[in-house]
């Protein structure tokens, strides 16, 4: 028969100490996720790879209001199409618009910024972002879908769809980059 010279209180303290050390080690190991990704670490979806865009160009920071749900829908759409997104919620979103010189009539609910400084305002479908990044027009700064048209990525409402224009942002007047008449024109 096994007998111990230790009291139950001593065993409890030792068990507690060992459990604490083990828990701390486990938490430390789980917390180390490594460096933040700079591009998708997995291969791009074939439909995205066909655009010939360098995966490093698919890293964006999205500036949006913390309470905006439709922006989350657009972020999910972008991530499904190979983009790596970091989201920021500035207290003064209007300062982001001013810093990037986005005219009031070209604004929407969020602004996405690449590391190269290209801006994508609002619910711009990934298809047009990829097309732009593959061959940016001379003098262009980015694209905008002003306002929040129903049926754009993140603004889906059943089968409803409002035609809209994707605007090319330049140092001069914006001009039409794409005229989207049907929801199917948004697909990558």
Language model features by range: what are they?
Residues 36-52:
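Low-complexity, Pro/Thr/Ser/Glu-rich flexible segments characteristic
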Residues 31-33:
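Bacterial signal peptide processing site
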Residues 1-26:
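N-terminal secretory signal peptides
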Residues 61, 72, 76, 80, ...:
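Solvent-exposed, polar/charged alpha-helical surfaces in well-ordered, non-transmembrane soluble domains
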Residues 59-60, 83-84, 116-119:
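Short active-site oxyanion
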Residues 99, 105-187:
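Thiol/selenol-based redox catalytic cores and closely related redox-interacting motifs
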Residues 53-73:
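Local sequence-structure signature of Cys/Sec-based thiol-disulfide redox active-site neighborhoods
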Residues 85-96, 106:
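Thiol-based oxidoreductase modules, predominantly thioredoxin-like and allied folds used
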